[in-house]
């Protein structure tokens, strides 16, 4: 059994997924920006499950970070046969009033890093004839999202890329699973600077553990695309039957509407 590599593993969904892999006896490579938080997760998992946990603190939004991570695992002789891309963030803002550095960081983390890690580790898995890849997308992948334009676009990228690569890897022993969750209690709302009435206050968010358990099961089944929660399933239906102009209005309302304070 090879290692499971999980990005964004210091908290939330990533930490819960790490625990699920460890419970099934998988050794782990866990990454996030904070070494201190990674060390805490490592200690708990090793003590509870008796697995080996390797930590690698890295900011995957930085240039060449995915290659650095792949070079590290390769140099350590770590064979990764389970890859989970969970790291990502959003920002509640008018697109033209956004901080461009933050928007660019979002593109790098949500799209570029995910794609490059899929490419590098996917090639290794294909050469070995087995492996699983899990990409966390969102209900946001199903429509355009005014006031969170870049985030919605990035999650549409994740879903499209995942489905296409899953098709290309048929018959190789490697599967790609894309899970689209709805609101989940992970600190997303605070990190995105959201306030007022929005999809977190208008719905009952899933817990990180609930979403992680669902995603883990779907990954192990080799599902290509999976929708978690009633809001996401409603979004999938809306994508098929409603006019795009209407879904944009719905998304803008659910995102909390126009931010009151412009960011420059």
Name each region found by the language model.
Residues 10-11:
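Conserved glycine-rich cofactor-binding loop
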Residues 138:
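Residue(s) in the substrate-gating loop at a strand-loop-helix junction
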Residues 94-107:
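Substrate-binding pocket helix/loop in short-chain dehydrogenase/reductase
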Residues 86-91:
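Conserved NAD(P)H cofactor-binding loop of Rossmann-fold oxidoreductase domains
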Residues 118, 154:
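Active-site helix of classical SDR
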Residues 24-40:
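Conserved glycine-rich Rossmann-like NAD(P)H-binding loop of the short-chain dehydrogenase/reductase
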Residues 178, 199-235:
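C-terminal helical subdomain
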């Amino acid at each position: 059994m090879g290692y499971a590599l999980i990005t964004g593993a210091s908290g939330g969904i990533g930490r819960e997924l790490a625990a699920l892999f460890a419970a099934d006896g998988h050794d782990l490579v866990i990454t996030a920006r904070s070494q201190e938080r990674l060390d805490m997760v490592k200690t708990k998992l090793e003590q509870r499950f008796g697995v080996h946990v390797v930590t690698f603190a890295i900011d995957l939004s930085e240039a060449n970070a995915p290659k650095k991570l792949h070079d590290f695992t390769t140099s350590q002789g770590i064979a990764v046969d389970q890859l989970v891309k969970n790291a990502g963030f959003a920002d509640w803002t008018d697109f033209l009033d956004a901080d461009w550095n933050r928007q660019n960081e979002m593109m790098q983390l949500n799209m570029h890093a995910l794609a490059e890690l899929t490419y590098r580790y996917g090639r290794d898995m294909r050469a070995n004839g087995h492996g699983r890849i899990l990409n966390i997308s969102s209900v946001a992948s199903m429509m355009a999202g005014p006031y969170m334009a870049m985030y919605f676009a990035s999650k549409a990228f994740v879903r499209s890329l995942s489905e296409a690569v899953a098709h290309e890897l048929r018959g190789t022993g490697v599967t790609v699973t894309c899970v689209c969750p709805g609101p989940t209690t992970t600190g997303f709302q605070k990190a995105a600077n959201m306030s007022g009435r929005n999809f977190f206050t208008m719905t009952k968010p899933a817990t990180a553990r609930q979403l992680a358990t669902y995603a883990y099961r779907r990954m192990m089944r080799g599902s290509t695309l999976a929708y978690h929660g009633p809001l996401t399933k409603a979004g999938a239906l809306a994508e098929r039957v409603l006019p795009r102009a209407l879904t944009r209005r719905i998304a803008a309302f659910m995102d909390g509407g126009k931010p009151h304070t412009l960011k420059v």
